[in-house]
Structures are given as structure tokens and as C-alpha cells.
Amino acid sequence: MIQQQTMLTVADNTGARKMMCIRVLGSSGRRYASLGDVIIGVVKDALPNMPVKKSDVVKAVVIRTVDTVRRPDGMCIRFDDNAAVIINNDGNPRGTRVFGPVARELREKNFTKIISLAPEVL
């Protein structure tokens, strides 16, 4: 469950390390984001000489959450951190690598490019 002011780890190689959620995209007044939801965030920590700089406002898709997500078959899934991948306006990832596992829920939301870059899909 990601809401405004939540700090997330950036799980790609765009140069950003930490970001803060400033808006959950969707219907008006939407409060929380879960796996596969798109958010707008600001980069709080970044590596030098990389495409994404500190204080850049970026779109990202949530790939891991600490909050438990229940699947239709009854299985519950939970991760150790809140993580996101920075995307462009077309929905494609800006980086060329994704670090760590991603949830299967991204495939249902048509983020297949992120699924193909991920080392493990849970």
C-alpha cells in the first residue's frame, strides 16, 4: 500500500536510488497504490552522471510492496521493501535492467517489458 510521502527503492539502472511518491494515478481522490499501479514521484537520491537526477519528477510503476497482497487463488505475497521502476510516458521502462524479483500482477496490467527484464517473477 503506497500513498503520498511513501519512500520507495528504485529497482532499475536509471541512476535513481530512492524516490518519494507524490501522487497515485488513477481515479480522482485515489489514496493507495498496490502492485502494478502507476505513481508519480520525485527522486530523492541519485547517482552522479546518470540520466535521472535528484529532484526530477518521474512516473513509476510499483513492483514490490511490504503490504500483503492476496491473490485470487488464496496465496498471499509480501516483499521486504517497497520498490518501483521508472517508466516513460508510453509505459516502457527508462532503464535497461531491473533488480530483484517482481510480482506476477504486472503481467495482468500489461507491463510485459518489465517482466522480461526482471531476473525473477513471483
Swiss-Prot record:
Pfam families: Ribosomal_L14
GO cellular component terms, A-Z: cytosolic large ribosomal subunit
Record keyword Signal present: no
SUPFAM superfamilies linked to this entry: Ribosomal protein L14
GO biological process per UniProt: translation
Source taxon at top rank: Bacteria
Disulfide bonds: none
Keywords: Ribonucleoprotein, Ribosomal protein, RNA-binding, rRNA-binding
InterPro entries attached to this UniProt entry: Ribosomal_uL14, Ribosomal_uL14_bac-type, Ribosomal_uL14_CS, Ribosomal_uL14_sf
GO MF annotation, one: structural constituent of ribosome
Free-text function comment from the UniProt entry: Binds to 23S rRNA. Forms part of two intersubunit bridges in the 70S ribosome.
Family membership noted in the UniProt record: Belongs to the universal ribosomal protein uL14 family.
Subunit structure and binding partners: Part of the 50S ribosomal subunit. Forms a cluster with proteins L3 and L19. In the 70S ribosome, L14 and L19 interact and together make contacts with the 16S rRNA in bridges B5 and B8.
Protein name: Large ribosomal subunit protein uL14
Source organism (scientific name): Synechococcus sp. (strain JA-2-3B'a(2-13))
Upper classification of the organism: Bacteria, Bacillati, Cyanobacteriota, Cyanophyceae, Synechococcales
Gene that produces this protein: rplN
